[in-house]
Amino acid sequence: FYTHINYHTMYKSLLELIKNEKDKYFFVETGCSAHGTKSTILWDKFINIFDGKVYSVDLNPNAVNITQKQVSKKTTVFCMNSLELLPQIDEQVDFLYLDSYDVDFLNPKPSAEHHLKEFNLIKHLLKPGSVVLIDDTPCSPEWLDGGMKSPIYEKLKKQFDPNMCGKGSLVNLELEK
C-alpha cells in the first residue's frame, strides 16, 4: 500500500506500476474529477499515450459535464450510481480507482461500506497485475500530517485505527482474509 503523500508522487508511482508491454489498458474510476484532483484527466492522458479506454462514473451531473468536456473520446463519463454501472462491465480491468463516496473521517464506515460494495461488484474482473487504488485511505497516522492541520485532524490522529481509516478500510480487511 502507498501512503497518500501527495497526488503527484502517488499518480506517478501508480502509472509506473501499470506501464508495461500491453496493447490497450482499461481504467475504471468511480467518482470523476472533483475538488481539483483531476484524476479522470490524468487517466485520459495515459490512455491517449498508451491506448485503451477509461470509464468514469459519478452521480453529480455538473461534475460529469465539466469532466466530459476535458477528456478525449477514449474516456466515457457516466452520470449514474457506480453500483449500477459496475455490474454492466464485462472486460478485465487493469486499473481500478475508487473515489465515489466522500469520506467523513469522524464516521468513515458509510463510505467504507460503499467502496466494499463497489469492489465486490468488480473484483472478478481484476487479474494479477491489476492496480486497485482507493482514495482517502490512510495507512498510518503520519498520513494525517500531510497538510491536514486542524483540531479535528489532531483528534483523528490520536484515535487512529488502521482497521477503520477511510474509504478503503473494509476492502483492505477483505483482501487480508
What are these regions (language model features)?
Residues 1-177:
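A short alpha-helical cap/connector motif
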